Amino acid sequence: MTWADLFGRVAESVVAKGKPPFDFAVVDEAQDVEVAELRFLAALATDRPDGLFFAGDLGQRIFQQPFSWLSLGVDVRGRSHTLRINYRTSHQIRAQADRLLPPSIADVDGNAEDRRATVSVFNGPAPTIEILADSDEEAEAVGRWVVDRIAEGVEPHEIGIFVRSSPQLRRARAAAKQSGVPATELGDKVETTPGRLSIGTMHLARGLEFRAVAVMACDDEVLPLQQRIEAVADDADLEDVYNTERHLLYVACTRARDHLLVTGVKPASEFLEDLLN
């Protein structure tokens, strides 16, 4: 049974019983809700216009292809509100990461998020972006950066190192080895370990927060991932691939509270030009 099948059966059960098991439902990370999951949530709400509360960020949509919520009976038009105060990320990191996204992002039903008026409540050092000659030089640079952060008082478990996909994890391991600080690879539980750096893929970074983050291996054909580009069938799919890959880098960068380092090897990802400019 697939995840979609499971939610489909549960939705049918809720409808058949006629009385939902909950009066209200709160949904976080709503930008990545899938079709079957939304059908289930719609069944929970029945005819209560205030039965569902969604919190999400279209700029962090990294899993789900866009689709119409309205077509599934969930209408949030005119009922959404954009949160504009950022408590997690410094002004400098947020402002630079925002260069990866357009000023306004809209969903399929026309609901738009205007990101231009967002403010952070604290300042910090400017992010560092480095394009290195090869992966050995990159590992040395990131290793030195980790040592510098620890010298400033950042604890090892407050430092995360992220890469696009599993094949690039070896570069994160190499950087951790250069720093001389032990590291833990994040798994399904996505838990940090006291006294150890955290390394993992960008998809595992969502929902986490670190005082310092290094985003490595931002190379050409790695970000955006060449395999995804080659697999698309038309221009619309290609645009969506580029958007989700941008969102993925945005998510990784905004896991940093105070310090952000972004690195790549020549030729670097085209997205780094957006971060720099």
PLM feature segments, named:
Residues 17-184, 188-197, 202-233, 241-243, ...:
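Conserved helicase motor core of SF1/SF2 NTP-dependent helicases
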Residues 1-23:
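Accessory N-terminal region flanking or inserted into the helicase ATPase core
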